[in-house]
Regions:
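Extended, charge-biased low-complexity segments
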Residues: 1-84, 88-91, 95-157
Length: 157
């Protein structure tokens, strides 16, 4: 059975920006441990490598055996405001949603948690350029202008 995420990958080689050598090493090491080499897992590994805190606590965030995120990590004492942004961005790109919202039972708490996934909340930090890189990894087919595709639509917006 074909994995549709594999088909979503751009055939062009992509330059990936890293904050540090430790970050780059983490990314390539964790890619070997995930279950699939698709854009979902690449974006997850890239995002979770952004912060030293998330690199150190990767096993509290993601289960490499099951392929499931561990939303309870957002309540752990090691988290900082920055690492929580990193985790939420990673979860959003990997799960296509806001999985930690289900950790709450009260509607108001769920809404507040959902708000923490907004562009404004996530991108208002020093990690924003790396979040944009993660989006490009996750959505390579949309991250660059495609003249051929544009022409297929008659060159009109």
């Amino acid at each position: 059975m074909n994995n549709t995420a594999l088909g979503a990958e751009n055939k062009k080689e992509q330059t990936i920006n890293f904050i540090s050598e430790a970050y780059e090493k983490f990314y390539y090491e964790k890619l070997k441990e995930v279950r699939y080499q698709d854009v979902y897992h690449k974006a997850l590994c890239y995002c979770l490598g952004i912060s030293d805190d998330t690199r150190r606590n990767i096993n509290s965030i993601y289960d490499f055996k099951t392929g499931c995120v561990k939303t309870e990590c957002l309540h752990e004492g090691w988290q900082t405001s920055g690492s929580m942004k990193v985790v939420r961005m990673a979860f959003n790109l990997y799960c296509n949603g806001t999985p930690s919202v289900d950790d709450y039972t009260k509607t108001e708490e769920q809404v507040n948690e959902c708000r923490r996934y907004t562009v404004e909340d996530l991108f208002c930090c020093a990690y924003a350029p790396f979040f944009w890189q993660a989006i490009q990894i996750r959505y390579p087919e949309y991250a660059t202008y495609n003249r051929e595709l544009y022409a297929l639509f008659g060159g009109a917006d």
